[in-house]
Amino acid sequence: MATLRTHNLTKSYGGRTVVRGVSLDVASGEIVGLLGPNGAGKTTTFYMTVGLTSPDSGTVELDGLDVTDDPMYVRARKGIGYLPQEASIFRGLTVEQNLLAILETMGLDAATRRTRLRELLAELNLTPLAHAQAHTLSGGERRRAEITRALVVSPKFILLDEPFAGIDPIAVSDIQKIIFHLKERGIGVLITDHNVRETLRITDRAYIVHGGVIVKSGTPDSLTEDEEVRRIYLGAEFRLD
């Protein structure tokens, strides 16, 4: 079983400490949320985990090996995929060309590339959109294409930054199903998103960050019933359903 883990991550900006010793872990086939109010430190923690920001202290480990100093492209090769909130697809290319752009960096022969391309397009039902220009895709279709592109290199983990932002309710449901599919494939998923209800509905467990520390962790049901979590984040009237 693969494991992605952080140990005692800290980060300060201009003398202000925004993350104070955060430790978390994600295992293969597990969907984990990283949640909290604005300014809590969750985004900085997420960025340190993926490699966008360097910690002042602490470590990030993949299967027990320290990857803290590895740049993002090295982490990706080792199995840590990342999907940013912003559009990351090449807008001037078709869906098929977006996937081929990654496949062509992998040293595969032409026949193997074409076979793998067909498999990837079919996996998340992108075959009908194979020749569509990326800039013509809806928000949900674009998310689907970006997740498929992340699957090209067979990641152990995928870190999703605001996957439910800017898409309509039907597309949210589709993306949730795709995330469940990643879980079924044995891929570990770490999600940070302001859409707390949509996130908690699909997570196995979640961490709640407040004031730069993890104040609570647990299953969605346990967190939504926790008085402190309601006080600092969810609100007294919050319900999952």
Predicted segments, located by residue:
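The feature captures the beta-strand-to-loop junction immediately N-terminal to the Walker
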Residues: L35-P37
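ABC ATPase NBD coupling module
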Residues: D66-G81, E86, A110-R114, A130, ...
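Conserved ABC ATPase "signature" region
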Residues: L100, A111-L129, Q176-F180
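Conserved ABC ATPase signature
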Residues: Q133-L137, E141
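Conserved catalytic motifs of ABC-family nucleotide-binding domains
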Residues: S154
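Catalytic Walker B motif of ABC-type/P-loop ATPase nucleotide-binding domains
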Residues: I158-E162
